[in-house]
Amino acid sequence: TARSRGLGDVYKRQLENCFRNYSEKGTCRYRHYIHNSNEENLYGAKPGNFTKWKKFEEPSDLLFYEGLHGAVVNEEINLARYADLKIGVVPVINLEWIQKIHRDTDSRGYSTEAVTDTILRRMHAYVHCICPQFTETDINFQRVPVVDTSNPLVARWIPTADESLVVIRFKDPHGIDFPYLVSMIHDSWMSRANSIVIPGGKLDLAMQLILTPLIGRLVNQAKRAI
């Protein structure tokens, strides 16, 4: 609806202000999205809602944002320009639908039909807002199931990590030590000059090997610039 799109634009502008303020001053306001009852108990807001905005109380080394809009670029907003390292974590679309249907029916009490309607209602935003961000990211981790997910609307189980591969794509492969990564991650291989494929169960290891030195470099560069 026009109203929901308007609220979405307001949220993105708030997020852009947060990124801009942190890049200029090293501080900004932040909030959490509540996914479940555990987070409700921790942060005091109902699942499906955001907590109130808060301001950083102490100096920090970096800002970590986890959400759906961290690399949005359109005619009015450019979030991607403020992020030093943009990471995309996304399953192939059928797996994404399976995960959403199971999560919303099992944990939130929705019917499959209601979740399907939500997916269809959000398709325009998915195509025009979500997908383009993965072109802006520096590294993408895409989970690909190796079992049949051809009809996600009737899938009885979510494919496990052992039933999946993960494709890791680097926007700029220069300086990436692919032979080292392949040697450290068992059963991995390069599928393109900028991509490596790993077993689904090795995702955590791959993230540690790839991201730890990159984040350490960002922190060191920031400290030297002060």
Give the role of each language-model region:
Residues 1-7, 11:
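Single conserved hydrophobic/aromatic residue that forms the stacking wall/gate
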Residues 6, 25, 108-109:
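Glycine-centered secondary-structure boundary/capping sites
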Residues 13-81, 121-133, 148:
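Glycine-rich phosphate-binding loop used to anchor ATP phosphates in small-molecule kinases
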Residues 50-58, 62, 93-226:
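C-terminal accessory "lid"/substrate-recognition subdomains
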Residues 66-67, 79-104:
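Conserved phosphate-donor/acceptor-positioning beta-strand/loop module used by diverse small-molecule
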